[in-house]
């Protein structure tokens, strides 16, 4: 068309607007990450939340650049020749995406996860969140709920206590600070020495579950269930979490099974009750509560009292489990205020909110955020279930603005939002028909294939390299510490980056017992030396630096 501007269809304009908004979001995230780099966030720091900013500074520049370039290329194609694209496709392109793609996605995702888990010294528990649930699982295997401390020295109960393991009310035992169901599920895998297999199987189940939910929503002959399964399977965060013993893959699977039950025919919805009990007691009730709340609110609005009462009964049972487990420790529940885990957000947390959204997108396959935005832009076309999925994502973002450790500390991708990855995949699939209509079937599938290839063969290996870089020093240092002959080893926890995470002891306090050097007083040290009849060994910083553990910078004098 010469001499006049082409009048674009509404679909073209909405797609272009979605691309532009995504580019703005990624660009804003890039500016924040650049600021972290310039302020030295790539180096070690003593703050417990600093690892979040360090991972952003070290790990995000390349994925952000790749997401930006990919989106620019899609925008260029849509703007340059949208009319021709929609009518150009090969005969084979009209065939729906078959279930074989789902099977291939499961196989490839599991293979990559296996490789990374083995490379991580058998999914070494880099974070104390991972170690604590395994600690509790080992207690269950020994036939105990609480680990009775085998010591006559009272102060050892604290100076030897690992992070996220808490003293019981009487002070004579230890118990995990997390709810018990995930540790129960972990037991057979911990017993055979492959605890990470649980999350690998959870991932396989999640891909199959999201495809099943997609077929419930859109029918078996639609491309969207397969697109949702591929979107989930190719997510770097999805694969990375399965190479760990974080509880998040289990949360994701149970949420998807719960949704499948709610959407099922006949009396299938009855399974939503016991599944809610499992989900609410995996390790924390919040991940499932945020996911399920919009669906439960809709039951109230539609006056579906029967289903609501059934699920509420199981929620009450879950609350009893939470109260009982809390009673094993201090009996305190999360509260607002200076001493609670919840607090009122401030302006700085809005920046963290932006970063959470960015991580949710940049750890996904590059096309998926665009498809999700396209689908959500057509809000009037979304079904009740699709809207509830979107509301669950928004609720998760909003809740963690009020969480004291809003930056999540350790975690690959946006760990706090892992339970909504299925929602992201399903909402991304809602944008697929419009994207395909604008760019054409053949072009759409090519962009999808490129997105999946970049995620699996470029982004995930990049993420895995960072996981290895950060985790292996702690794995090797931990093995070395466990091989030392002394009864007590004092770790210079205040001089090492995340030095407190090296203190990992069973309740039996088998040798060597690792101690928090920062918490041990001189008098307590003398008591230990007198008990042993020989000096307690102080581990030097240089002894641990040989494995790659980093020294903390000395604080500036005031």
Question: How should each PLM-predicted stretch be described?
Answer:
Residues 1-3, 71-80, 205-211, 292-302, ...:
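Hydrophobic, aromatic-rich transmembrane alpha-helices
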Residues 102-105, 210-236, 252-253, 266-271, ...:
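Transmembrane-helix signature of polytopic, membrane-embedded enzymes
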Residues 26-33, 103-113, 226-228, 232, ...:
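Transmembrane alpha-helix segments characteristic
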Residues 133-134, 248, 388-391, 409-436:
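Hydrophobic/aromatic-rich transmembrane helices and adjacent perimembrane loops
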Residues 280-374, 396:
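Membrane-lumen/periplasm interface segments of specific transmembrane helices
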Residues 128, 196-208, 227-257, 262, ...:
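Multi-pass, polyprenyl lipid-linked donor-dependent membrane glycosyltransferases
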Residues 142-182, 186, 340:
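Interfacial juxtamembrane loops and adjacent helix segments
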Residues 97-107, 226, 270, 311-319, ...:
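Signature aromatic-anchored transmembrane alpha helix within multi-pass, membrane-resident enzymes
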């Amino acid at each position: 068309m010469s001499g006049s501007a082409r009048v674009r269809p509404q679909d073209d304009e909405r797609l272009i607007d979605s691309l532009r908004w995504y580019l703005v979001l990624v660009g804003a995230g890039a500016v924040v990450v650049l600021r972290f780099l310039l302020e030295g966030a790539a180096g070690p720091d003593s703050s417990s939340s600093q690892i979040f900013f360090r991972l952003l500074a070290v790990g995000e520049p390349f994925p952000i650049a790749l997401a930006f370039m990919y989106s620019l290329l899609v925008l260029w194609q849509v703007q340059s020749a949208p009319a021709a694209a929609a009518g150009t496709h090969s005969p084979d392109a009209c065939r729906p995406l078959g279930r074989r793609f789902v099977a291939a996605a499961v196989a490839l995702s599991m293979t990559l996860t296996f490789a990374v888990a083995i490379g991580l010294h058998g999914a070494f528990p880099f974070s104390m969140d991972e170690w604590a649930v395994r600690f509790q699982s080992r207690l269950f295997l020994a036939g105990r709920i609480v680990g009775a401390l085998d010591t006559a020295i009272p102060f050892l109960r604290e100076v030897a206590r690992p992070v996220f393991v808490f003293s019981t009310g009487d002070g004579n035992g230890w118990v995990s600070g997390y709810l018990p169901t995930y540790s129960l599920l972990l037991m057979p895998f911990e017993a055979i020495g492959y605890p990470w297999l649980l999350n690998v199987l959870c991932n396989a189940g999640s891909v199959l579950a999201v495809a099943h939910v997609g077929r419930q929503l859109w029918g078996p002959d639609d491309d969207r269930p397969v697109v949702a399964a591929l979107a989930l399977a190719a997510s770097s965060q999805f694969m990375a979490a399965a190479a760990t013993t974080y509880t998040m893959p289990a949360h994701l699977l149970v949420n998807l099974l719960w949704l499948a039950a709610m959407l099922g025919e006949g009396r299938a919805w009855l399974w939503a009750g016991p599944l809610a009990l499992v989900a609410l007691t995996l390790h924390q009730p919040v991940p499932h509560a945020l996911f399920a709340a919009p669906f439960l609110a809709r039951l109230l609005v539609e006056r579906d009292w029967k289903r609501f009462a059934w699920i509420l009964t199981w929620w009450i049972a879950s609350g009893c489990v939470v109260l009982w487990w809390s009673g094993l420790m201090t009996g305190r529940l999360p509260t607002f205020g200076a001493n609670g885990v919840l607090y009122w957000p401030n302006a700085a947390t809005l920046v963290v909110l932006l970063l959470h959204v960015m991580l949710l997108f940049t750890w996904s396959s590059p096309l998926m955020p665009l498809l999700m935005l396209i689908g959500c832009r057509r809000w009037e076309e979304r079904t009740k279930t699709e809207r509830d999925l979107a509301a669950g994502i928004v609720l998760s973002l909003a809740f963690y603005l009020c969480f004291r450790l809003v930056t999540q500390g350790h975690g690959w991708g946006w760990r706090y939002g892992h339970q909504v990855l299925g929602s992201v995949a399903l909402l991304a699939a809602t944008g697929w028909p419009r994207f395909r209509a604008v760019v054409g079937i053949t072009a759409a599938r090519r962009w999808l294939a490129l997105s999946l290839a970049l995620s699996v063969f470029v982004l995930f290996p990049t993420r895995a390299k960072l996981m290895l870089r950060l985790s292996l020093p702690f794995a090797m240092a931990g093995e070395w510490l466990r091989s030392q002959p002394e009864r007590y080893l004092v770790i210079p926890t205040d001089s090492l980056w995340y030095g407190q995470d090296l203190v990992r002891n069973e309740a039996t306090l088998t040798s060597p017992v690792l101690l928090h050097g920062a918490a041990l007083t001189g008098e307590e040290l003398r008591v230990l030396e007198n008990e042993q009849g020989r000096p307690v060994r102080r581990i030097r910083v240089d002894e641990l630096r040989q494995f790659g553990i980093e020294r903390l910078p000395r604080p500036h004098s005031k």
